């Protein structure tokens, strides 16, 4: 029985005719409960694979009024990571993937308060220049004047020694 299941899984994967992007970037567990903490989630379009793990170096970061951090991540130079960026990332975000850890700062935008109410995040944002491994939901932010791709919400950020 186990052998037959393994064969079926193998055939299903092999029949696609291409290697799955999800397996190339080593996707892990994404915490779905964090979506309750996303301000205006309708602006975010989940992409495939929806849960990804990437590596790169922390760049510019700043706090946002919705309580989120905005972090630019310079992805490691792996060919598969280049596919994660679009033109808006290249032009408006200096070629970086955006990370959006949710509710990590005080919310100052009145209509965003409810998303972070009674929530204490467990994430620590490493300093600029730190090499990290990041897991979270891969999305495109379709808010006005955005259009770039992000990991939002971020499930984990781990420094790489």
Where are these regions (language model features)?
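N-terminal secretory targeting signals
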Residues: 10-18
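Sec-dependent signal peptide recognition
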Residues: 1-8
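OB-fold and OB-like single-stranded nucleic-acid-recognition modules
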Residues: 17-161
């Amino acid at each position: 029985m186990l052998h037959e299941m393994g064969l079926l899984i193998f055939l299903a994967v092999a029949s696609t005719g291409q290697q799955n992007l999800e397996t190339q970037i080593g996707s892990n567990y994404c915490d779905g409960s964090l979506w309750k903490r996303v301000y205006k989630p309708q602006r975010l379009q989940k992409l495939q694979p929806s849960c990804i793990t990437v590596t790169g170096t922390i760049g510019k970061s700043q706090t946002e009024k919705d309580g989120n951090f905005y972090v630019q991540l310079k992805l490691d130079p792996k060919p598969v990571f280049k596919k994660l960026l679009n033109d808006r990332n290249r032009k408006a975000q200096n070629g970086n993937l955006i990370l959006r850890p949710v509710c990590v700062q005080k919310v100052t935008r009145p209509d965003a308060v409810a998303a972070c109410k009674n929530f204490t995040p467990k994430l620590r944002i490493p300093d600029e220049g730190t090499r990290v491994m990041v897991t979270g939901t891969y999305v495109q932010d379709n808010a006005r004047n955005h259009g770039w791709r992000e990991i939002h919400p971020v499930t984990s950020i781990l420094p790489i020694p």
